């Protein structure tokens, strides 16, 4: 482990935030929104020099688009996309979002009802009224429909998939290229890659990987390769775990509870976010008492107190807001630490999460995970 990398991981949020404020440049001359880590520093004449010039931009689906770059007005679907855009210093360029983003008024105070264009179905009239140059959607979003509805108005549809952890650096660099934030994007790629490389290096010492049962917000729903929860399966693999439901031939996301008891996993992780839209969670985590109540409910499941992970204290609840951060790298760091604490001595997931929040212009206001106490024989 390089000392320089260790310093990066241990670096305080305040120092990182100060550096980001120097590097970042917003899209408006007004100085930026609350929660944006990067205020406006780009001179207006630099933007004017590029007006009318188009560049071929290749999006996440490999589509070649002729765009005027950098983009200065965008509507963006998917909270993970919005986080990447804000992290590279282009948060002020976003003029409209979906409800998965705007529901979190603490984390995204600049987006209210007027700036929200829908949930899984988009309000195209509102998007047109917001006057963006582009609509950014993930590849599992309303891509074809959006193209059909918006291109007659001169609004291009760009595919960036911020939730996809198969190639996070690619998604970051797409954001950097689109908004003219290439330098900031490369810094973010480095922040992502260093802990990933460290985890990979340390896992070379593991002869037999430990098993994991990961549960989503709905009871007995999990991540199976090839489903829309595939990214969470990849997170388990990145952390050095073996998904007990990692068989791609399994259909859907719901599983037979009996299979959990038969597998007797080494680690159990449950996504819990409280009362929010979807399972992605929000900046303000549920209180520890609420996490504990959900854990107690799960412990009442038949046979659960006899599970190895439960008896040995390897049972955690956490939010997808935290574990899904930066292409689920944050979640992989926590899981790797929980699985192999003796190997991951240089890994500090709390520090990584704090630094990721600094990229967003925030400091964590609550703990986003809960460690369920070991349920020994006395329990």
Predicted regions and their residues:
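Flexible, glycine-rich surface segments
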Residues: 226-296, 300-302
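N-terminal low-complexity, Pro/Thr/Ser-rich intrinsically disordered segments
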Residues: 38-68
């Amino acid at each position: 482990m390089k000392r320089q990398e260790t310093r990066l991981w241990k670096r305080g949020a305040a120092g990182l935030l100060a550096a980001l404020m120097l590097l970042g440049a917003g899209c408006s001359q007004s100085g930026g929104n609350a929660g944006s880590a990067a205020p406006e520093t780009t001179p207006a004449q630099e933007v004017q020099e590029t007006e009318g010039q188009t560049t071929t931009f290749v999006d996440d689906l490999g589509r070649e688009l002729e765009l005027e770059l950098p983009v200065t007005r965008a509507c963006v679907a998917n909270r993970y996309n919005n986080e990447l855009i804000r992290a590279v210093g282009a948060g002020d360029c976003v003029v409209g979002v979906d409800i998965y983003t705007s529901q979190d008024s603490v984390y995204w105070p600049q987006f209210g009802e007027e700036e929200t264009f829908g949930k899984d179905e988009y309000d195209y009239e509102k998007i047109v009224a917001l006057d963006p140059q582009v609509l950014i959607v993930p590849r599992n979003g309303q891509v074809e429909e959006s193209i059909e509805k918006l291109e007659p108005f001169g609004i291009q549809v760009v595919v960036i998939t911020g939730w996809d952890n198969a190639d996070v650096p690619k998604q970051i660099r797409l954001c950097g290229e689109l908004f003219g934030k290439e330098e900031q994007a490369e810094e973010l790629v480095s922040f992502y890659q260093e802990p990933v490389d460290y985890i990979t290096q340390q896992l070379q010492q593991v002869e037999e990987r430990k098993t994991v049962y990961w549960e989503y917000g709905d009871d007995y729903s999990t991540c199976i390769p090839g489903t829309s929860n595939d990214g969470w399966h990849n997170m388990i693999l990145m952390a050095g775990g073996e998904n007990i439901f990692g068989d791609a031939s399994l259909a859907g996301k719901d599983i037979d509870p009996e299979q959990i008891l038969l597998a007797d996993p080494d680690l159990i992780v449950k996504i819990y976010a409280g009362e929010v839209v979807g399972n992605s969670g929000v900046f303000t985590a549920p209180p520890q008492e609420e996490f504990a109540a959900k854990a107690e409910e799960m412990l009442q499941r038949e046979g659960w107190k006899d599970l190895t992970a439960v008896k040995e204290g390897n049972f955690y609840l956490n939010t997808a807001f935290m574990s899904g951060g930066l292409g689920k790298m944050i979640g992989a760091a926590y899981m790797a630490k929980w699985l192999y604490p003796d190997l991951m001595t240089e890994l500090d997931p709390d520090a990584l999460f704090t630094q990721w929040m600094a990229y967003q212009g925030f400091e964590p206001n609550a703990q986003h995970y809960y460690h369920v106490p070991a349920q020994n024989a006395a329990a």
